[in-house]
Amino acid sequence: MLRSTGFFRSIDCPYWAGAPGGPCRRPYCHFRHRGARGPGAPGSGGAASPASGLGYDPYNPELPQPPVQRENGALGQGDGMLELELVNQAIEAVRGEVELEQRRYQELLETARGHSAGPSALAPCSPATSIDDDDTFSLALTYTPGGLLSPDAAYQPTPLAVPAEPGHKYSLAPSDRSQGRAAGGAGALEYVPKAVGQPRRCGRPVSGGKYVVDSSKPSTDLEYDPLSNYSARHLGRASARDERATKRPRGSRGAEPYTPALKKPCDPFGGCEARFSDSEDDVTSPPKADVSSPKAGADPESKAPGKPVSKEGREHEDGGLRGTKEMAVQYDVEDLGQPPKAPDTVSVVKPGSPARASQDARVPKEGKAKKKKSGTSASLSHKDKVRKKDKKKEKDPARPRGKEKVCTDKKKLPASNPRGKAQGPEGTKKKPSSATTVASSGKGGSGRPSSTGPQDSGPGPHAPLAWKAGSAKKMSSGKLVERKARSLDEGAPQDTPKLKKRALSHAELFGDESEEEDSSLGAGAPRVWPPTLPSLSSDSESDSDSSLGLDETKVPKRLKAAPPASPVPPSPLSSSSSSSGASQCAEEDVDYSALEKEVDFDVDPMEECLRIFNESTSVKTEDKGRLARQPPKEKAEEKTHAGLTTLFPGQKRRVSHLCKPGKESEAPKRTPVAPPARPPTAQEVCYRRAQLAQRDSASWLQAAPRPTERLSSVHISAPGEKRRIAHVPNPRLAAAPTGAKRALSASSSQASHGPEPGSQPLKTRTLSGMASKTTTTVTPKRIAHSPSLQSLKKPVIPKEFGGKVPTVVRQRYLNLFIEECLKFCSSNQEAIEKALNEEKVAYDRSPSKNIYLNVAVNTLKKLRGLVPNTVPNLSKASGRRVVSHEVVLGGKLAAKTSFSLSRPSSPRVEELKGTALYSRLREYLLTQEQLKENGYPFPHPERPGGAIIFTAEEKKPKDPSCRICCRCGTEYLVSSSGRCVRSEECYYHWGRLRRNRVAGGWETQYMCCSAAVGSVGCQVAKQHVQDGRKENLEGFVRTFQKELPEDAHAGVFALDCEMSYTTYGLELTRVTVVDTDMQVVYDTFVKPDNEVVDYNTRFSGVTEADLVDTSITLRDVQAVLLSMFSADTILIGHSLESDLLALKVIHGTVVDTSVLFPHRLGLPYKRSLRNLMADYLRQIIQDNVDGHSSSEDASACMHLVIWKIREDAKTKR
């Protein structure tokens, strides 16, 4: 059956009473059974029915635990026996035991309260302590119910719900007990299950922390759970341990996850529950021992496993068997059902459960200290002792011996008094429990709860320990080896929860560390307890958080509780040693004597485990910052540390593990208050030195009065000290900026008079043992060496498969573009963006690598041409700063004038402007012959307004309607209006032909696509077009003479026009005029007289949008130009004849750059303006994909002419 969610537990079962077939016999009944359990009826609430309660208690913590226990008992008696009689029997047994336990725990509670009131440390926690005591007693009471239920054996079946049920039982039992104490009686028990047990159970199982519940509430104590077992003894320690969640109680959180445990008890009753019973006996047995007898202890044991008889037998089993069980518990906590750990736990719990009750009361409020004082000894059950012993054995077999002697001595002195004290409040109860436990062979450890028990009945604990050791040996050297390996592996992680419980888990190792911590934390409380075994338990309890954590690590509960336990690092060993040396000695004496006999002398792997444990312990303590807490530890703790330290000198020698009693005295002598101090490693030394050096330099820099000293702080010295920097003067001066150099020069001048680098001030600033160079490493002087420009992360052009230009070439030019753009761009990002755009344009315009190289070179020249604009300003500014002797002695022009006979190599360049430029340009005017050769228009001698061209070849087609395409050379027919008769696409090459020398001759190719002559054109137009300018020579105008003042000149202008194809050929669409200052004086779009067929945007840059709103006609432009120009005005242009033909203007005073810079092959070849600018002026023009710009071309012509004049002037001189 699936476990019930408990939705119907508040509804009375219709078959429970008055049913014709008798009371409800369904074990899975989801309804409430009233009167199922007398004492638990009021508290059980919805769990009254034994079967249903049993089924639900594990999962529904709210249900009263007494019913759960009954139900568990009923189920435990037989897996298949679910008869109502069994349930009734369980109920009766529970009732009787509950009453007995209530009485006994009331007495124990009073005693515990009195004892808790005694210790000063417990006083502040008295309220909590009393409550915790109730919880502790309730735990013991819980155990007693377990014992009562154990005969029923019905509890064993309950293991299905064991994780939760035990938790519930504990909760109910503690509730009942605590309430019984308050109210005193079964009624109190009933009340607790209802109010306390269920709420606590619900909250705790939900949180998954039975263990926590046990520590804080008595109800969890009454609950029986393998986890609760530890919580029972743990409750004395519960608060701390629960917080740590080292034990199963926390495991009970895992217990809900531990539902497998419930299943586990069901399938292997004896296996899973036997272990629980063992742990429970250890935990809860002491209360029973006090009240009932070993029998009661056995009953609780049977409760946990569900096999009462087997548990009693186990209790009475040989010490060897119990030792084996304890070893199993310690080393294999995961095996919940293993009985071997039962003896250990039983012996431990018997003495400690009453004390645990008191301790639990204390722990919730004060934590470890309260636990230690009030019920630490009691709370440390024999199982805890055994676990501690085992842990200590593992830690250092030699140390246990020494400790035993020392502890025995201590016990003799202070133990008698503290024992009396501890026994006073708790001793009475603890002693009966210890006696009872001693009576039972398995519970001989119970003597430990009583102060005399550990010492006088030390053989009892020793015997169990010996049994443990013997059983451990029996268990298999393999297991020990596994434990060692696990302890080694787990020793690295200091978290007990992570460790496995079978091996000396790191949790156990860590538990030892926790002991040390707890000892430091609760040293005061242990002082009250130390003489008594309870003080040992108090040590464990102070450690109980850790020691129980260790024990729990060994025990199934600790498996579950282990993860929570890790938060509470203190280990039982360390805390016990620190809390009470005497009690620790008692524990160590008992445990280590047995271990020494059986383990230490034999070549047992445990020795290595102990050595490793000790080593890891020291490391853990250091890592966890326990050093600060350890100094106040008691002498006993010091001895314990001494025993630990003895291993360090001879870590690799086994002899160190076999420390003999005589060595113990030596150990205390060299025992450091803190874990043995080890010399720092080389890395630590270097790190510390570096930190100190940095602090030293930082403080000195702050104290430095002037920034100049900071700049020269390379020499790290006192602020006012003068330093000599002979060792690093040049690099710093060379790399430092100008301001820094001045500061350095000043500081160096001071340093020249200062002491040597090894002067005393410098030594005082350096750490002892550190080279003086350390000071220089701290100085940030290398900053001066860093370049002024930050390293720029340049973009990378992605590789393109099959690209027309190699990526490497593109990347090289992109880097060059970025460098040039950085010179005039305001930011790096702007420069990168501009360079990327320029490179992208060049790549898009280049169909081949050769063309890309040309375009890239031109682009680079253009970018370089933009830089000089800013350079002159910088040079002037820098020149102003220079003050030389010549300027001072000779005046303003002294630095620029030479008084020597030798003339300067470079002549002084005159400014070319105005009349000077005009006069110089007259030398470059085209002659009449040149005008005719280049096709300039002349006035027609016969027709006014007509023009004549002397180079025009008259090609008169036979058919007047036939035209020849000027782009592809195809003949096509036109109508009278000039339109094509037939629509036909035009395939042409827009580039010029270029001849290249190849092997065996010359090769002519088109520049646009590098195709051979005669190949199909690379561009496509909608129709054919014609030039038509030379055929339409009408409408020309001629410039005329104008009178000018004597000082004036006719003017110099650069002219450029853009044309588009119309139905009658090329016509003017834009005109631009630029003066000598490169300023545009006239620029306008012109509307053609005929319909535009092709705007020729590639070359003209004119688009349809530009001419939409244009109303200026050619006649308007002619009028403007005639008003601006005269017959003597010099016009500059490239192939200016084409522009004059488009303007239909006749002008003979021109300077043509195509003639000024002729082609090497002569006419008709001409060099392009773009190439001229790139070759002579290192500037790139016409690189805009949108087409040429007439203003750019005009300005380029003006630059070329002026440059030509200056160059010629140099040669003529």
Curated annotation (Swiss-Prot):
CDD domains per UniProt: REX1_like
Keyword Hydrolase set for record: yes
Which residues in this protein are found as Omega-N-methylarginine? 181
Q: Where is the composition biased (Basic and acidic residues)?
A: 298-325, 393-412, 480-489, 620-641
Q: Which organism is it from?
A: Mus musculus (Mouse)
**Residue ranges with Low complexity bias:** 468-479, 534-550, 573-583
Cytoplasm as UniProt keyword: no
Residues bearing Phosphoserine are 277, 279, 353, 487, 514, 906
Name recorded for this polypeptide: RNA exonuclease 1 homolog
Protein's job: Seems to have no detectable effect on transcription elongation in vitro.
